[in-house]
Amino acid sequence: MIRVIQPPLIASKQLFRRYLATGGTFTNKTSQLDRATLTIKDGPVFSGYSFGANKNISGEAVFTTSLVGYPESMTDPSYKGQILCFTQPLIGNYGVPSSTLKDEFNLLKHMESPSVQCIGIVVADVALEYSHWTAVESLQQWCQRSGVAAISGVDTRQLVSYLREKGSSLAKITIGEEYDADEDAAFEDPGSVNLVHKVSTKAPFHISCPEKYAKGLHIAVLDCGAKENILRCLVERGASLTVFPYNYPIDKIANKFDGIFISNGPGDPTHCSSTTENLAKTMEKYHDLPIFGICLGHQLLALASGARTIKMKYGNRAHNIPALDLTTGKCHITSQNHGYSVDAETLDSDWEPYFTNLNDLSNEGMKHKSRPIFSTQFHPEAKGGPLDTAFLFDKFFENIEQYRATNGLNLGNVDDSLLVDILPKGRVL
């Protein structure tokens, strides 16, 4: 028998205070919203209210325990195809900032990609009214404008308890007054397709470094779904970037750059076999070339070196996960968003673990024992989250400077065959 869990009459202390302050008049606007249902495949059914796009959707239900940063999370390409549940009870209270405003590097100032990447969101209580000096619209308006399904009034504590016990599950959000268990909308598994292909640039593009930051460095970026703040962290340290599609044969031109960076991204890393093959060739041909990978980039680098990746039960998605630096013994608080991890037991003898998750003891990084190559499962750039490990970008740049000094070459300018001057200046979708 399927149990339908009804939304609470008053979903939060905030609404209860409002209820008392108005003399017992319930002033929340959820009564004006359409009813909606969140259905977990082979699991519970939650009834709530729709405040997003008026459409039915299906995807993988995951959760984040991050307290803030919902605009950044929702535009993170790593969430492509997923239904994101926020454990923070009240979401939307500071609204949504501009999704088009750019900074001095021509990168989005507030968002991590040009569009919302998750297919739907689940919250306990949505703030339909907002207050913040950077906000230009409400979360409701943004979801509706972006075509994102959104449901509020859900018992997110019970939902997260289920996902922690059973693991990340397929789910769907349907709009309508009555739940129909025989509804023909199928449960679609986003993990069955190559999600990286959907979020990666379709052609190379170039990001110039402003003169006041420039150090004459040029880094090649493999775009598996790169967050804007990752690109910003590279440019603000003095490098121009040429960003390539995830499956670009980087081994053929890697020696034209000062370093290679492999970005974050969504889904199963084994779907990117061409990327791992190209990385393996690159490491075989250029022994001293600095390489740095983050999140999916970490997993792809591990696969390229002969290690194995595994799907986690429910993944790690939060801004407060402790990671132990096995080199220094220091513990850092990190921002994470991933459903797969590297099996440290399968690392080749030339590699060693770099960081370990102190919550579940999963691998959080690796490094080569004799070459300037390392990677992390967590996000040193955060956005949102702590910046405890931002020093890893500095480490990457130190490796680059040493590489240039050792080779005695000025590698900062790529040859004319790449036609950097005429490359697009933004991601080609």
UniProtKB/Swiss-Prot annotation:
Keywords: Amino-acid biosynthesis, Arginine biosynthesis, ATP-binding, Glutamine amidotransferase, Ligase, Mitochondrion, Nucleotide-binding, Transit peptide. SMART domains: CPSase_sm_chain (SM01097). InterPro entries: Anth_synth/Amidotransfase, CarbamoylP_synth_ssu, CarbamoylP_synth_ssu_N, CarbP_synth_ssu_N_sf, Class_I_gatase-like, CPSase_GATase1, GATASE. Residues 1-20 form a transit peptide. GO terms for molecular function: ATP binding; carbamoyl-phosphate synthase (glutamine-hydrolyzing) activity; glutaminase activity. The active site is at C295, H379, E381. Pfam families: CPSase_sm_chain, GATase. It catalyses: hydrogencarbonate + L-glutamine + 2 ATP + H2O = carbamoyl phosphate + L-glutamate + 2 ADP + phosphate + 2 H(+). Its main location: mitochondrion. It is found in: Mitochondrion matrix. Signal peptide: none annotated. Its EC number is 6.3.5.5. Pathway: Amino-acid biosynthesis; L-arginine biosynthesis; carbamoyl phosphate from bicarbonate: step 1/1. One of its GO terms (biological process) is pyrimidine nucleotide biosynthetic process. SUPFAM superfamilies: Carbamoyl phosphate synthetase, small subunit N-terminal domain, Class I glutamine amidotransferase-like. Residues 218-406 form the Glutamine amidotransferase type-1 domain. GO terms for cellular component: carbamoyl-phosphate synthase complex; mitochondrial matrix. Belongs to the CarA family. PANTHER family: CARBAMOYL-PHOSPHATE SYNTHASE SMALL CHAIN, MULTIFUNCTIONAL TRYPTOPHAN BIOSYNTHESIS PROTEIN-RELATED. Heterodimer composed of 2 chains; the small (or glutamine) chain promotes the hydrolysis of glutamine to ammonia, which is used by the large (or ammonia) chain to synthesize carbamoyl phosphate. Small subunit of the arginine-specific carbamoyl phosphate synthase (CPSase). CPSase catalyzes the formation of carbamoyl phosphate from the ammonia moiety of glutamine, carbonate, and phosphate donated by ATP, the first step of the arginine biosynthetic pathway. The small subunit (glutamine amidotransferase) binds and cleaves glutamine to supply the large subunit with the substrate ammonia. This is Carbamoyl phosphate synthase arginine-specific small chain. It comes from Debaryomyces hansenii (strain ATCC 36239 / CBS 767 / BCRC 21394 / JCM 1990 / NBRC 0083 / IGC 2968).
